[in-house]
Amino acid sequence: MNTFHLMLNLVKNAIEGTAFPKAEFSEKTLKDLFELSSDYSLANIVGYALINGGVLGSDEYSACFKNTVCAAVFLDAQMQRELGAMSRVFKSSGIEYIPLKGAVLKQYYPESWFRSCSDIDILVHKDDLEKAAEVLENELSYVPVHKGTHDISFFSKSSVHIEFHYELIEKDF
């Protein structure tokens, strides 16, 4: 079985919650598997399957997989905490919003941290944009970092990246 098919089988096992047949993996196989699954943003899921299969040891690439799983779980928890805090302050301020993309899709994965995300995308009505930005800055200490043609970016104190979208389609597109 080549590395790509091995990766797909491990992802399938993780998603279905089934065990991967017990096997020995060489350090080269783990290296190739880690590099390939990282390229596809699947190293966290592949790592989870390998951990559940009892495959990982104490070598360098086993550690890479374990660290990737831990980082994915940690980032997901941070993002969920920030989204919850934002939801509370927006509700109390009367700001309507719609979470977009990964923040919504995560609920359909067996584990929310299976869905790799680098930011939280939020649709805010253009009329509420200034108020929403002010609430994030004043009540949650977010820092604005960029204003584009269809979004504004912020970072939380814990380095979670939030994008307010006020246009779903770029005007220059």
Language-model features, listed with the residues they occupy:
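Conserved NTP-donor binding/palm subdomain of two-metal-ion nucleotidyltransferases/polymerases, i.e.
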Residues: 1-118, 124-173
